[in-house]
Amino acid sequence: MAQTDVLNVTGNKIGTVELKDSIFNIEPNYDVMFRYVDMQLANRRAGTAKAKTRSEVSGGGRKPWPQKHTGRARTGSIRNPLWRHGGVIHGPKPKDWSKKLNKKMKKLALKSALSLRFKEGNLVVVDDIKLDRPKTKQMREIVKNLGLSDAKKVLFILPWKRDEYENVKLSGRNIPGVKVIIADNPGNLVNGRSSNIDGLNVFDILNHEKIVFTVDLVRKIEEVLG
């Protein structure tokens, strides 16, 4: 099994944790990761864009002017797509952009993303992170203590106990390049809801340079993906 150091919020090493090779040390499958991210971004789309066609624009029931003897170009309706405020030709219509991926591929994509970051040395494990109240200054200190100040993007993924970690999430909102997400309940990691951007997901893992986990979350990930 692979090993990595466990740090506390002051940046001191307090032990080590073993990581399952089958989850954190596999050969990354870039094709499956692409498919997962493609699905995730597609599922974000509302698909509500809509433009009115000639038949849907209001007005235009009568001919604007006679066909002949005006010296003007002939036209039959103010709803003509060539007119300002007229209908739209081939405009967008409401559409379901959502995509699906089977559970096996979702698991492989998550394992691949985690393994990629671990092999790069960009996976940081802490014992726990908790704050009594939202405080950006304290969160900045934690980022600095963990040696992550120089990273362009840092992702904190915390356990699904939202009430316990809500202050940490709020404290990280105003720090540029820092994002804090509360992971889904482990049972939801590979179902449809795991593609939500506010849960453990491949897009955020790949989109951030450094990833910070708690020991509890590592164990739950191994339990579900193992």
UniProtKB/Swiss-Prot annotation:
Tell me which positions the record assigns to the signal sequence.
none
Q: Name one GO molecular function term.
A: structural constituent of ribosome
Q: Name one GO cellular component term.
A: ribonucleoprotein complex
Instruction: Fetch the Pfam families from UniProt.
Output: Ribosomal_L4
Keyword field: Ribonucleoprotein, Ribosomal protein, RNA-binding, rRNA-binding
| Function in brief | One of the primary rRNA binding proteins, this protein initially binds near the 5'-end of the 23S rRNA. It is important during the early stages of 50S assembly. It makes multiple contacts with different domains of the 23S rRNA in the assembled 50S subunit and ribosome. Forms part of the polypeptide exit tunnel.
- PANTHER family recorded: 50S RIBOSOMAL PROTEIN L4, LARGE RIBOSOMAL SUBUNIT PROTEIN UL4M
Q: Could you say which protein family the record assigns here?
A: Belongs to the universal ribosomal protein uL4 family.
Subunit structure as annotated in this protein's UniProt entry: Part of the 50S ribosomal subunit.
Protein name per its UniProtKB record: Large ribosomal subunit protein uL4
Where does this protein come from, organism-wise?
Kosmotoga olearia (strain ATCC BAA-1733 / DSM 21960 / TBF 19.5.1)
Q: Which gene encodes it?
A: rplD
